[in-house]
Amino acid sequence: MHDKILILDFGSQVTQLIARRVREAHVYCEIHPNDVSDEFVREFAPKAVILSGSHASTYEDHQLRAPQAVWDLGVPVLGICYGMQTMAVQLGGKVEWSDHREFGYAEMRAHGHTRLLDGIEDFTTAEGHGMLKVWMSHGDKVAELPPGFALMASTPSCPIAGMADEARGYYAVQFHPEVTHTVKGRQIIERFVLQIAGAKPDWIMSNHIEEAVAKIREQVGDEEVILGLSGGVDSSVAAALIHRAIGDQLTCVFVDHGLLRLNEGKMVLDMFEGRLHAKVVHVDASEQFLGHLTGVTDPEAKRKIIGREFVEVFQAEAKKLSKAKWLAQGTIYPDVVESGGTKTKKATTIKSHHNVGGLPETLGLKLLEPLRDLFKDEVRELGVALGLPPEMVYRHPFPGPGLGVRILGEVKREYADLLRRADAIFIEELRGTTATTQDAAAGLCGEADVGKTWYDLTSQAFAVFLPVKSVGVMGDGRTYDYVTSLRAVQTTDFMTAHWAHLPYALLGRASNRIINEVRGINRVVYDISGKPPATIEWE
């Protein structure tokens, strides 16, 4: 029986990151809405409770509170951002609107020597104060500590940025330790979970395989399952896991919607039929998809259409399988959170995903999502544990809607053909270029990264087609052709990301090749936006 951490979700977009950090400490956790009953909290029997952030305000909204049972259990509690504020209010403190809202990077001073922060610091001031580089995102502030609490941290704009009641094991921070921008955030959460809560670090992927296989077999029984392959990591690992559980009861449906990467169809069929020996049905539905996308420019509408057409194709294939009762998808946690699909339904929707946003109730198939509670790095770990080849597991993610969300505005076959070739050239250059000692000296990578390809050093890289034309000169003639943007990011969880600082020489070669080899593109730009504020995909 695993020790469990209960994460109460108040609607933050990054609540799942808290779960990821807890699991990185090899401790099992679950996310549940903040308004669960006292009985549920008691029956869950957590080793500790973590209260998430929220886009709401404790000062204005008095409905979002933690159940009373949280305070009656006698277990450690960690409040994060809004979680700190509701802890303060519920335990007798005071929260008010801040005149100095904090959004982004901040330097925070630790006070005292609490068990949570003692010895954890990024640098020390000349006066000897330990400082932490943290990520803030709040408009309210704790103005008065609850009885029994002491000041744990502060910033110039937030006098109470952390508080602690060590006797009861209650800790709260105004910053977000779960995001990668907080340098020591992972260490802080690990200390809370392992040392303060005393949870056993026994959550590993091999255990998850056994549990997931058993769950799939129990759910499916002797019924048949169809799964749509996109060529990406998520659907590949989902297929391998389900195949491990039920073998030939699984039929993989590979849909060519006309929005695939260059030579993707052949690669997917060779990999799954040749390596996994799985049943794969190849469906060419490119005319159907592109026809329905004609004239559509709104990103949400495009995603909905692509999702709807996937469902129709699956329904048609399911009718050919007499026992097909299940539709399997490679949905993972980031898909769910970006669709406003956390269990509380309080998160603000950023964009819908075809995996979770276009499935009608009239589908006629039950939904099987074995990866729904996993993050991308966990999915990769699971793939390795399942014995999948590295070229499959560590391939960059590819969205289900394919190039449809990498072509801005209306999707046309002409645009898709241009983008396919530009994208392939960019990936070739990333795969063919290794990091050098000069790159490390310039701060583009770490010394341990020297010798690795830039494809392996980036988490996701691709080209984006911009349906605008610019003037150029090639030879002695004037050109008026399209623009493409290159995008490469580095991240551990895909909830936040930094743009990749690629060598100029690599970018120069990619640009030169695209302009010379892809007739119809005469300008290449590089996207240097992080997430947040941008998302990784452009649409």
Curated annotation (Swiss-Prot):
Alphabetized Pfam families for the sequence: GATase (PF00117), GMP_synt_C (PF00958), NAD_synthase (PF02540)
Residues annotated as domain GMPS ATP-PPase: 203-395
Residue stretches making up the Glutamine amidotransferase type-1 domain: 4-202
Ligase recorded as keyword: yes
Gene Ontology molecular functions: ATP binding; GMP synthase activity
Catalytic activity of the protein: XMP + L-glutamine + ATP + H2O = GMP + L-glutamate + AMP + diphosphate + 2 H(+)
Pathway assigned to this chain's UniProt record: Purine metabolism; GMP biosynthesis; GMP from XMP (L-Gln route): step 1/1
Cellular compartments per GO CC: cytosol
UniProt superkingdom: Bacteria
Binding site for ATP: 230-236
Keywords: ATP-binding, Glutamine amidotransferase, GMP biosynthesis, Ligase, Nucleotide-binding, Purine biosynthesis
EC assignment: 6.3.5.2
Record-annotated active site: 81 (nucleophile), 176, 178
Signal peptide location: none
The keyword rRNA-binding is annotated on this UniProt entry: no
Oligomer status and interactors: Homodimer.
Function: Catalyzes the synthesis of GMP from XMP.
Entry protein name: GMP synthase [glutamine-hydrolyzing]
Organism: Burkholderia ambifaria (strain MC40-6)
Organism taxonomic ancestry: Bacteria, Pseudomonadati, Pseudomonadota, Betaproteobacteria, Burkholderiales
